[in-house]
Structures are given as C-alpha cells and as structure tokens.
Amino acid sequence: LDYRTRYLDRIIEVPASAWDSLLPEHPAAGLVSHGMLAAFEEADCLGPQTGWEVHHWTLWDAEDNLVAAMPLYRKWHSYGEYVFDWAWANAYARHGFDYYPKWLSALPFTPISGPRLLRKHNDLMIMPRMLADLKALDGSSAHCLFSDGLNESDLKAMQEASWMRRTGVQFHWYQANYKDFEDFLNALSQSKRKKIRAERRKVNEQGIRFEHKTGADLHENDWAFFYACYERTYRMHGNAPYLTLAFFLRLHESQPERSVLFLGHDELGPCCASLLFRHKDRAFGRYWGAIRDYPFVHFEACYYQPIEWAIREGIQCIEGGAQGQHKMARGFDPAPTESWHWLRHPSFANAVEQFLSKEGLHMEHLLDELQEHRAFKSVR
C-alpha cells in the first residue's frame, strides 16, 4: 500500500475525529485521545521550553486518510518519564557521546500502560514502517514507554529491528466481586485488615470528611484548590510541577467525565485532594496533595476512598501509578509493565541489552517475591 509519513508539531494539525477513530478497545485508550494530548500541548506543559518537542508520527494512505498514528516527542532530558535511563545518558557522556536528543513515544508525565501505536486496521506493514521511520530520525535512541496491547507480529517486528524490552512493576487494585469496603477488608489477612481500620479511624478522629466530584459537579474553584495541593506537594520535594492549572481546566473542558476528584475537609474547609482518571471500568490514580497535613490522610485520599468509590461504581481495576510497594499492604497487587528501547550505537546497544537481561531476571524474582507478600488471605 502507498503510505505517506507526516510528523505533526501540534496534535490539532489533525482533526480529533480522525485521531480518535484509531483508538483501540483498551482500558487506557482514552488517555492517548486527541483531547488528552491536546491538553498537554495547549496548557504549555510541552514545547521546546520544556525539553519536550512535539513530533507526532502519522501515516496516511493514497486517499489522504489517516491510517495510523503515535504520540512522539523529541526529548532533551529524561524527566517526567518514570522509566529511568539517566545511567545510560551518563554512560554516553563519559564516552564523549550525546544521548540527547532522543525520541520518546509515551503519555507525558503519566506512568500508565496503554496503546502507543494507533491503527485503523491491522496491516502488518504499519509497525515495520513506523520503526523504520523512527530509525531515520536524527537522535541517539528511541523509546516506547508503558506500552501495552502489542500482538505477536508487532513483537516480531520490534525484535527484528533490534528493539529491547524492559520490564517494571506497578501496583494495582482489582475488583473481586466485593459488595462494599467491608467485604474487601474481609478478604485481607487479619493484620492488614486491623491496620487499615486503625488508619481510617485515626483520620475520622481528626475530623476529616471526604467527598468526591466528577463531571458537571467539578467547578473551577475545585480545580484551583486541587492545583494548590498538587503544586505544594511538588514544591515540598524541591521540584517545580510538570503540569499547569490550565492543563486540568482544559482536560475538564474537553473530557469532563475523565476526572474523579476526592476532596478531604477539616473544620477550616478543604485540606487535601487526590485525582483519578477514569476510562470505562478502569481508574488510574494520578495526583495527590494537601494544604494542611494530617497523619494517614494520604492513605485515605489515595486508596481507601477510591476503593470504596470503585466498588460502588463497578470499577474493575485501580492502577496505582509509579512505584509504591507500601500499596501492597492496602490491597494492591503487583502488576508487570513493559517498555521498549532502541539505541543507534551498536556498542551501547549491546551493553544495555546485557543490563536489561540481568534486570529482567531480577524483576522476575521480585514479582514472584511480591506475590508471596500479598495482603490477602492465602485462600481468597
């Protein structure tokens, strides 16, 4: 077939209807929608000034129909990725080579597994074409982070093109026909159940009350308060926040049903907030913060309130985001993730391949070990 590649400096160069027509049936497909990617760009979270240059890959047929697309960025650093390659960059620098710029296909600042290559139909030539196009770009390497939904043909094409798989682990909560939160607690071991009840009791004794809002119930003042919490959390760790208030307002404007905000109140008013993204029967824990600090409120806002809500709403899974082994004590289970990497320099590619082989074995052992320390009773 006669395909033509075109790179986009802005997602709005293609109609939302054309881009979104490529989204597959996947729990996280909505997170690579036109509206989500546009929110990052239009709110100035991306661009040359941030070290994220938009360069989305698109493929068009002879009739000028969009047949495939992939979010793509030219990166001048490794911030906001949650798959860590700083050591690779340092190794390049020690040997006098430039690691940056590199090419990255990912959902910016968001460690959620999902589709990256979007296709109208399953033409077996699309994946090899995309890989060849990336190789032709000027840069040290290309990376596809938190990729999910690849088929056997995709895997074969990536391996033949010398792409390397890297595994990681996150922690997800799964619905198991729980009727309510108490039913969920009863599935846990006694020690974990006791600990959670104690933590919730202490939050209650401090006079913290929670509500959740979504869709039309969310107003600009709710977002302004959430952003104050979000920004304070980043500043307390000595970092500037990646996202702007305009991003959240833009996302709410285009996809009001996407966000679920949990708000904690003390006697002075709102004191903390956590934000989840929702897509169909799956939820994704994203951000948390507080303007006044209380013990155990983080667990209530980020885990217990969302789990209660998920059981009521028929949500089948809450993805807990990056890292956080402490989530296991609160009923989250380990879940593997994968990313793919291609390095142009043969010697560095060989070294990274050996490193990833060892790291992969370590991750296998870690996942096995984590399974043995689940919070649930041995017979569930």
What residue spans do the PLM features occupy?
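N-acyltransferase acceptor-side catalytic subdomain
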Residues: 1-380
